[in-house]
């Protein structure tokens, strides 16, 4: 799905980093290159940032826009990708990520240190009505956009200049387990009929 979504969004140079021999052996279109992921970066515990820093260092030689589309977000659409690219193009961001609005009551939460409740945000939010709290967004992992040189020099996604492209709850479903896969599959079948 990620390849088709990227192509539909107008992305002309697509790299796939994988350890799957099935994907590596597939005859991809000219604009798609499958690259063997080094074994030490092909574990379930490997952070995505390590895979990306290796990819930009060895396979993306010049500064260009990088759009990361994780395969675990199959309900993302081409218009989401184009929208996020537009946010990046018209902002002054180091990175743009897709996100979904979440329950505002998270602003009422805190950390327990000894017997002390330390609010995670402004103390007055703990005692505010939920509906009066500001909107809260959570990165959904569907889209990351950044320049190759920024990631190469930063070696991290950490930044104070993060742009946001909002996606719906339905489009933000992420596959983490078999139940998620079944829900995504049902949504795709419903959408395609």
Question: Which residues does each PLM region occupy?
Answer:
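Short phosphate-binding loop-to-helix
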Residues: 5-7, 15, 21-67, 75-79, ...
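Short active-site oxyanion
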Residues: 10-15, 94, 170-171
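Short, high-confidence coil segments that cap the C-terminus of an alpha-helix
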Residues: 11, 61-63, 90-94
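A structural signal for isolated positions on well-ordered beta-strands in alpha/beta enzyme cores
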Residues: 13-15, 67, 96, 163
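Short beta-strand scaffold positions
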Residues: 16-18, 145, 175
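Short beta-strand/turn micro-motifs composed of small residues
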Residues: 18-19, 70, 99
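Conserved core of the sugar-phosphate nucleotidyltransferase
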Residues: 50, 74-161, 166
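Catalytic donor-sugar/metal-binding loop of nucleotide-sugar-dependent glycosyltransferases
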Residues: 151-173, 178-193
